[in-house]
């Protein structure tokens, strides 16, 4: 399958990010786009996502949902064009080694009084 664009959500759940991908933002995605959520479930408005999926306009792969475990009767299970994994996306053989290396690097920068990597500033 060829996707016109891929949106990957990798961010923490905060007051600002809750329902960040609501019906309005989902509607801004290109036809044929793929939404991948490996962040936190409540970042995506699940009802709006189900509507978009069932329209066939976009597809999605979600490793997280706004209710975990997702109830067996939840409409997301029956939505078109969705892959649901059981919150295991970050569990790889390389994860711990890379995470330790990143944390060590950030702590060294902090101790040296240097700017940290990967800092997100509100409003930018």
Task: Indicate where each model-derived feature is located.
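Rossmann-like adenosine-cofactor binding region
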Residues: 3-75
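C-terminal helix-to-coil terminal segments
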Residues: 68-124
């Amino acid at each position: 399958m060829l996707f016109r664009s891929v949106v990957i959500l990798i961010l923490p759940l905060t007051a600002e990010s809750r329902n960040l991908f609501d019906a309005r933002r989902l509607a801004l995605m290109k036809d044929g786009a793929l939404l991948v959520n490996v962040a936190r479930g409540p970042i995506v408005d699940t009802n709006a996502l189900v509507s978009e999926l069932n329209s066939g306009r976009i597809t999605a792969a979600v490793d997280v949902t706004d209710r975990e475990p997702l109830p067996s009767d939840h409409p997301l299970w029956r939505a078109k064009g969705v892959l649901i994994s059981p919150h295991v996306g970050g569990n790889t053989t390389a994860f711990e080694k890379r995470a330790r290396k990143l944390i060590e690097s950030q702590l060294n920068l902090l101790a040296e009084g240097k700017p940290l990597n990967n800092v997100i500033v509100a409003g930018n």
